[in-house]
Design a protein with these regions (language model features):
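Short, basic/aromatic-enriched C-terminal tail that caps enzymatic domains
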Residues: 1-4, 239-253
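Ferredoxin-reductase
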Residues: 2-84
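FNR/FR-type flavoprotein reductase catalytic core
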Residues: 76-214
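Local cysteine-cluster metal-coordination motifs and their immediate loop/turn environment
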Residues: 118, 192, 215-247
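Structural signal for conserved beta-strand scaffold positions within catalytic alpha/beta enzyme cores
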Residues: 12, 57, 157-159, 211, ...
Length: 253
């Protein structure tokens, strides 16, 4: 796993929704090797423990990396206070990303809440072959829909309260699309119960599926056991590091 650590200039910052921020980081040496599904480990000012944040976009031409995150604790709140022109301490790119297969003709991307940003690089790669299903609590939490449409993807929006889009779980339109039998692959990121159900649906439909796990992390490089999780391969249980072996896993694992 090749990665680098340094302080990089913030090229842009904006609020996308309540407590959700987007930051563009100038880091050409990282964008050259980063791939969809990987993450960055950011050190908030005044803290000693880094925070893992998924990569939302990789612009090799401009040499900028985009992250989108929600402010849940003190660490992410400090990151959100950083402004354009300031430096951000980052270890990146980390983890095992998504499998890209250009033979796929129809791709379904499923994002739940803050699990939606990692889907954007895939939408940009697969373009018009992509249908993006996004799920949020309410209309005020919706993000990145214009970005997905700009990438050429078809979008299906779901909310828990029905304040915009469909009032349903993301698994409902997913099952409908698979019933039509026109999907070659599913990529998903979001809460564990959502990923578990998507994995079951994919296996029952015989469709290739990869999921990106959201997990607490310590070192980010596989040296500690904070993010260890059970996986299954060839009928046997194994332990894997989400930060190193993941965060992307085949759904059958």
């Amino acid at each position: 796993m090749k990665y680098t650590q340094g302080k990089y200039q913030i090229a842009g910052k904006r609020a996308l929704a309540k407590d959700i921020f987007s930051i563009d980081i100038k880091c050409p040496e990282i964008t050259e090797i980063a791939c969809p599904g990987q993450f960055v480990h950011i050190l908030p000012p005044g803290f000693t423990l880094r925070r893992p944040i998924s990569i939302c976009d990789i612009d090799k031409k401009s040499g900028t990396l985009r992250i989108v995150f929600i402010t849940k604790g003190d660490g992410t709140k400090e990151i959100a206070k950083l402004n354009e022109g300031e430096l951000i301490d980052m270890l990146a790119p980390l983890g095992h990303g998504f499998t890209i297969d250009n033979s796929f003709k129809k791709i379904i991307l499923v994002g739940g809440g803050i699990g939606t940003p990692p889907m954007l690089p895939l939408a940009k790669i697969y373009g018009e072959r992509t249908t993006v299903i996004s799920g949020f609590r309410s209309a005020e939490a919706v993000i990145l829909q214009r970005d997905f449409k700009a990438a050429g993807a078809e979008t299906i929006l779901c909310t828990d309260d029905g304040s915009t889009g469909r009032k349903c779980l993301v698994t409902e339109p997913l099952a409908e699309l698979l019933k039509e039998g026109n999907a070659d692959a599913i990529y998903a990121c979001g809460p564990a119960p959502m990923l578990k159900r998507i994995s079951e649906i994919a296996e029952n439909s015989g469709v290739f599926c990869e999921v990106s796990l959201e997990e607490r992390m310590g070192c980010g490089i596989g040296a500690c056991l904070v993010c260890a999780c059970k996986t299954r391969k060839d009928g046997e249980e194994h332990f894997a590091h989400v930060c190193k072996n993941g965060p992307v896993f085949n759904s059958k694992e």
